[in-house]
């Protein structure tokens, strides 16, 4: 490891020792951050996989139920049921800081004035069968899970990027900066010891 190109003076030695303390402390903090990010990242990956499997199963089941419910209805009536969009959804995003990583938090609010006027469903449920009602309601309930899945996947992406950045910084300190500082400190200490011995020899010669 090449040492730093500095003058071998006591002032430089003191500066380098301070830099080494700072680098060592920073290295520990970054390692702790990296380890905690990795722990949370693994938890989120697990949640992401479980959520995706659950949503895929529920969507497949809902689709089958919808096909069966649709089969017992007149095609024109089914089109009329969904002809007018009356379900209004408001989505907003907050930012949460996790280990210095800004991640999104999705919030959703259903604003359905016509639903309140017409009843539980946002379409003419009086004209539909109970199977269709249940299928539509189950699909609506999936919205929160879908938003959570999007939130988790985006958080995983942002965390993965920050983990990689932190890993590079840790490696830079561990394998480059800290060894350079240590080697340069050792070099200056040797030079100062040599200068001190040479000075002592000169003094002894003068006094002898």
From Swiss-Prot:
InterPro entries: V_ATPase_D. GO terms for molecular function: ATP binding; proton-transporting ATP synthase activity, rotational mechanism; proton-transporting ATPase activity, rotational mechanism. The keyword Ion transport applies. The keyword Nucleotide-binding does not apply. Keywords: ATP synthesis, Hydrogen ion transport, Ion transport, Transport. GO terms for biological process: proton motive force-driven plasma membrane ATP synthesis. Gene3D superfamilies: 1.10.287.3240. Produces ATP from ADP in the presence of a proton gradient across the membrane. PANTHER family: V-TYPE ATP SYNTHASE SUBUNIT D (PTHR11671). NCBIfam families: PRK00373.1-5, V_ATPase_subD. This is V-type ATP synthase subunit D. The lineage of its organism: Bacteria, Bacillati, Bacillota, Bacilli, Lactobacillales. The gene is atpD.
């Amino acid at each position: 490891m090449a040492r730093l190109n500095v003058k071998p003076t006591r002032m430089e030695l003191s500066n380098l020792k301070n830099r080494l303390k700072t680098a060592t402390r920073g290295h520990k903090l970054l390692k702790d951050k990296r380890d905690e990010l990795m722990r949370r990242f693994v938890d989120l990956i697990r949640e992401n996989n479980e959520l995706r499997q659950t949503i895929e199963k529920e969507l497949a089941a809902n689709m089958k139920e919808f096909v069966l419910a649709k089969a017992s209805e007149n095609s024109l009536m089914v089109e009329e049921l969904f002809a007018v969009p009356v379900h209004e959804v408001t989505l907003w995003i907050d930012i949460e800081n996790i280990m210095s990583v800004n991640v999104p938090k999705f919030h959703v609010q259903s604003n359905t004035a016509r639903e309140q006027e017409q009843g539980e469903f946002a379409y003419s449920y009086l004209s539909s069968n109970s199977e269709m009602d249940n299928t539509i309601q189950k699909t609506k309930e999936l919205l929160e899970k879908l938003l959570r899945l999007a939130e988790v996947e985006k958080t995983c992406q942002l965390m993965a990027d920050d983990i990689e950045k932190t890993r590079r910084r840790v490696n830079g300190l561990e394998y480059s900066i800290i060894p350079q500082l240590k080697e340069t400190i050792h070099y200056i200490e040797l030079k100062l010891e040599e200068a001190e011995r040479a000075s002592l020899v000169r003094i002894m010669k003068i006094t002898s």
